[in-house]
Amino acid sequence: MQLKCPCFVSLGTRQPVWKKLHVSSGFFSGLGLFLLLLSSLCAASAETEVGAMVGSNVVLSCIDPHRRHFNLSGLYVYWQIENPEVSVTYYLPYKSPGINVDSSYKNRGHLSLDSMKQGNFSLYLKNVTPQDTQEFTCRVFMNTATELVKILEEVVRLRVAANFSTPVISTSDSSNPGQERTYTCMSKNGYPEPNLYWINTTDNSLIDTALQNNTVYLNKLGLYDVISTLRLPWTSRGDVLCCVENVALHQNITSISQAESFTGNNTKNPQETHNNELKVLVPVLAVLAAAAFVSFIIYRRTRPHRSYTGPKTVQLELTDHA
């Protein structure tokens, strides 16, 4: 829904510049026409781009370049998405905000009244979602004695991203000569849609895409999951690398799988290997300690008890000689 100012010019209507400024017809020839066209090009290119991670908060800037002070009783501020028309938030004098706001932005977008008095009409957007990848338009109008004049318009393109999980690689089928080996790589909960590559680590070359089958789909969170299946002829040695690329974050996440493993999850994880070793070592040490303790108890019980008679013997010998 596109909001309209009652009894004034609607948001989608632009009053001609020559009517607002009362410019004579001679202005549209020569230098005057050139300057007008130049100003139109500059206005059309006034677009900024902002990046945000899913679940984070972001500020979409809309600031008066002159940083003038404003009386809120004469201001009308609108933040909306143009195509399709979606009302994000707005400020109307003496009106309760949020009544006509789209349900997906209720309690997520707000304006600061104190900041608006200083010429800062920025949108504070909470809990960013993938669906917020949009162009947001800020329009500020000031009420004069006769009309509502637009004093500021900004377009902000929001690009949303989310990190993909570390790829998990598994292999199946026999690793015997003459048979085919199948690799599967899976990564979840990223945004936007990723690129996935398989790399031969022997020479760091990209593996032919004809040998792989990639499937990308949106999950219930609105994020992307990707799964890829790669089929290669058997080789005695030849590790492969699965690489998931997030273009928005300029990020590559990789995992390596060894060809000599037969089945199961072959993604190398040093921490997991260390934990498995500890799980085996601790019980063995406990058994050895218990066996040593039992042996010590048995030894103490079976050792013969002898009396110490040395001094008595010496005393007896002295008595006989006497």
Swiss-Prot record:
The keyword Disulfide bond applies. Residues 1-43 form the signal peptide. Residues 299-322 are cytoplasmic. Glycans are attached at N71, N120, N163, N200, N213, N252, N265. Residues 47-277 are extracellular. InterPro entries: CD80_C2-set, Ig-like_dom, Ig-like_dom_sf, Ig-like_fold, Ig_sub, Ig_V-set, IgSF_BTN/MOG. Expressed in lymphoid tissues, primarily in B-cell areas. In the lymph nodes, strongly expressed in the cortex and in both primary and secondary follicles. In other lymphoid tissues, primarily found in the marginal zone of the spleen, the follicles in the Peyer's patches and the medulla of the thymus. Detected on resting splenic T-cells (at protein level). Also expressed in nonlymphoid tissues, such as lung and thymus, as well as, at very low levels, in kidney, liver, peritoneum and testis. It is a single-pass type I membrane protein. Residues 49-149 form the Ig-like V-type domain. GO terms for biological process: isotype switching; positive regulation of activated T cell proliferation; positive regulation of interleukin-4 production; signal transduction; T cell activation. The chain crosses the membrane at residues 278-298. It is found in: Cell membrane. Coiled coil: none annotated. The keyword Acyltransferase does not apply. Disulfide bonds join C62-C138, C185-C243. Induction: Up-regulated by TNF and LPS in nonlymphoid tissues. Ligand for the T-cell-specific cell surface receptor ICOS. Acts as a costimulatory signal for T-cell proliferation and cytokine secretion; also induces B-cell proliferation and differentiation into plasma cells. Could play an important role in mediating local tissue responses to inflammatory conditions, as well as in modulating the secondary immune response by co-stimulating memory T-cell function. During pregnancy, may function to skew the cytokine of maternal T-cells toward immunoprotective Th2 phenotype. Interacts with CTLA4 (in vitro). The interaction with CTLA4 is not observed in different experimental settings. Belongs to the immunoglobulin superfamily. BTN/MOG family. This is ICOS ligand. It comes from Mus musculus (Mouse). The lineage of its organism: Eukaryota, Metazoa, Chordata, Craniata, Vertebrata.
